Design a protein with these regions (language model features):
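Short glycine/proline-enriched turns and hinge-like loops at secondary-structure junctions
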Residues: 422, 439-443
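N-terminal non-catalytic structural scaffold regions of very large proteins
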Residues: 1-233, 237-397, 407, 421, ...
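Short beta-strand-initiation
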Residues: 80-81, 415, 425-426
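Active-site lining segments that contact anionic ligands and/or coordinate catalytic metals
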Residues: 425-428, 485
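Single, functionally critical "micro-switch" positions that shape active/binding sites
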Residues: 88-89, 435, 439
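Conserved helicase core region in the C-terminal RecA-like lobe
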Residues: 428-435, 442
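Active-site-adjacent loop/helix segments that line or gate small-molecule/cofactor pockets in enzymes
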Residues: 404-412
Length: 650
């Protein structure tokens, strides 16, 4: 609103000058029943405002999106400004990229006592938890926070319905060697007298340990266990879809069944207490533990960049918005209960008048302004997620957009997470990192790195089955252990098995190059497993495809690119260039220059200097410098005097 009482659209530069937040209103359509009357508010006139969402500059809903240089100048914006930041109370704020260990993936590592351990961080829209399978004294144990102690693996498998010892051995891998390794674990279950599924559930019921009053997204607390032993579970787990309704008092076996269905390995679906998919997953984890005991080379490296995911501003704001929206609903429910309980109401009660628009607005603003991200449901409590955009120079602002923040403690003097990994080649800048305690923990993206977003899984699932993947319910353990067969994983979920994994991966890649699949879908086969990934947060980069020793991109293509008759997206659509993530790079042979291309080469680098970031890329002849000198210049180059932006004097 101007001085003359006229209104006009808000621009980012207005927000900078007036110390206000650049945000867009969130409108919803509302439909609810009042007595026997259906109240509907929708459309442009009837929609209801529930809050305001801070907008990222140059995003699709920003007024600057798609604007020409002339329009940007009229709006007081610099045409070279990259965007990608928020304006909160007049201050420019950047949400730093957050580095996380990948979810729903099996990671093999040594635990604190030196034992081989397979761990999975299960993450769903409801909860996040970690499950471990550990080898200790020749036996396998499952460990989870909801179970009091380490539980013998065979008891867990029996509770899931795998009662027969022969079935367990065949699912883990078959063969006399596997039977010999599993014998102590099977014997341990027999010693405690667990032979049937019901006995296993009763035994596990005494070990269930869930907090009392765990409501909302956690397991249902409507049926507390009898107060007999203190180790008994205090709350029941959330039953999967199609499960029988909860009773007032529940047996320990029911609690154990619900915990196995909805809490342990929560990302593996269980429908109507059919545990077959979860049994296969647990057995796959056990098989990897046994294989790693025999061959330590099969252990995973936690610092390997294929096991990392990057969280961007959209995911972080989405988590926060979901939490605030649930809080708004809870406040609205309480306000409606209070209003309807009044005996002296004069007119019809309108619940929409109780909606508070400041709950979501203030929650998002406070998080962006302070940098404190708190989501209780996922036990997330992070500090310093946002920082004030550095405007020392144009290059310092640009470099801050590509900064990656690790969750590792800066004070710990550990070299592993700080070291430069070979898997970071082409994905992260090898030079641009701060000196001192944050060295190696704060990193920067390389010039051509792309961070993926989530893609729909269902088309990939159908395609995998069409290309010969056999569904899990149709397979026995002997078929899974057949020579050459491989389990097919889609984003951490077991789809089934394929008899020719290398051929399956090649067909998927051919479809991706033909444009039938998303360009960021990744597929790679390794040691009896084939992984398809379409989840968000993976780092990938473009490479030129090489066929029979000849690069697909020719001089004619480059001339068309210079003449602007072809764009970069055309190279992707025509199958000349493709994006590879870190895992798929392991299946490729990449040449640095055309002179290095041989018959076995699969890809060619677009340009070797693209391994550097946006700041290190400005250093002249960096390969003639001692490496610490490049790191020092990355810090000092951001402090150079120069024009910050074209609009710095407005």
């Amino acid at each position: 609103v101007e001085e003359d009482a006229c209104t006009r659209p808000l621009t980012p530069h207005d927000c900078r000058l007036r110390d206000c937040t650049y945000a867009a209103p969130i409108y919803v359509d509302v439909e609810y029943t009042r007595g026997k009357e259906l109240v509907v508010r929708r459309g442009h006139s009837g929609r209801v405002l529930i809050g305001r969402l801070p907008l990222m500059l140059r995003s699709s809903h920003c007024v600057l999106a798609g604007a020409s240089e002339e329009q940007l100048a009229r709006l007081g914006e610099c045409p070279l400004d990259p965007g990608g930041y928020f304006i909160v109370k007049g201050t420019e704020k950047v949400v730093l990229i957050q580095e996380q260990l990948s979810k729903n993936r099996i990671i093999l590592d040594l635990d604190a006592k030196g034992a081989v351990c397979a761990s999975v961080t299960s993450s769903t829209h409801e909860r996040k938890s970690k499950t471990h399978i550990t080898a200790r004294a020749g036996r396998l144990y499952l460990r989870h926070n909801s179970l009091g102690d380490d539980v013998p693996l065979c008891i867990v498998l029996r509770a899931m319905g795998a009662v027969c010892d022969q079935e367990i051995v065949s699912l883990v891998g078959g063969g006399a060697n596997v039977a010999h390794l599993l014998a102590p674990s099977i014997q341990e279950a027999a010693v405690v007298g667990v032979h049937t599924q019901q006995q296993a559930l009763d035994w596990l019921g005494a070990k269930v340990r869930l907090p009392r009053g765990n409501s909302g997204s956690g397991p249902s607390s409507s049926g507390a266990a009898p107060p007999a032993p203190p180790a008994a579970g205090a709350a029941a787990g959330a039953a999967p879809a199609g499960a029988p309704p909860t009773r007032a008092r529940r047996s320990r076996a029911d609690e154990a069944r619900d915990v196995l269905a909805g809490v342990v390995l929560a990302h593996v679906p269980v429908d109507r207490y059919d545990f077959s998919a979860k049994v296969q997953y647990v057995c796959a984890m056990a098989a990897r533990v046994l294989a790693a005991q025999a061959d330590p080379a099969q252990l995973d490296d936690k610092d390997y960049y294929g096991n990392k995911r990057l969280e961007l501003a959209g995911q972080l704001l989405g988590l926060l918005f979901e939490d605030l929206f649930k809080r708004l609903n809870a406040e609205l429910r309480r306000a409606a209960d209070t209003g309807l309980s009044r005996a002296n109401r004069a007119g019809a009660f309108d619940v929409l008048k109780c909606i508070r628009t400041d709950t979501i607005t203030n929650g998002l603003e406070h998080a962006l302004a302070s940098g404190n991200w708190t989501v209780k449901r996922f036990r997330m409590d992070r500090k310093g997620v946002t920082q004030v955009l550095s405007r020392l120079s144009f290059i310092s602002a640009l470099g801050m957009m590509t900064r990656i923040n690790s969750q590792f403690e800066k004070t710990r003097k550990v070299s592993g997470p700080r070291a430069l990994q070979p898997s970071q080649w082409g994905m992260l800048c090898p030079s641009d990192t701060p000196e001192g305690e944050a060295c190696g923990l704060v990193k920067n993206l390389a010039l051509m790195t792309h961070v993926t977003t989530d893609e729909e899984e269902e088309p990939l699932r159908r395609l995998a089955f069409a290309l010969g993947t056999e569904p899990l319910p149709l397979l026995a353990g002997a078929q899974l252990g057949a020579t050459g067969a491989a389990l097919v994983f889609l984003n951490g979920h077991v789809l089934g098995a394929h008899r020719w994994p290398a051929r399956f991966a090649e067909r998927l890649r051919a479809l991706r190059r033909a444009g039938r699949l998303g360009e960021f879908v990744s597929v790679h086969a390794v040691a009896g497993r084939c992984y398809i990934a379409s989840d968000g947060g993976r780092v990938c980069r473009p490479l030129i495809i090489v066929r029979d020793g000849t690069p697909a991109v020719t001089d004619a293509h480059l001339a068309a690119l210079r003449a602007k008759t072809l764009a970069f997206v055309d190279f992707i659509e025509r199958g000349l260039v493709e994006y590879l993530d870190v895992n798929e790079e392991n299946d490729s042979l990449i040449a640095l220059t055309p002179a290095h291309v041989t018959r076995s080469t699969t890809h060619l680098e677009i340009e070797p200097f693209t391994i550097l970031g946006v700041v290190a890329g400005l250093i002249p002849y960096p390969h003639h410098n001692q490496s610490p000198r490049n790191t020092y210049q990355c810090a000092m180059g951001k402090q150079a005097m120069g024009a910050v932006a074209f609009n710095q004097n407005i």
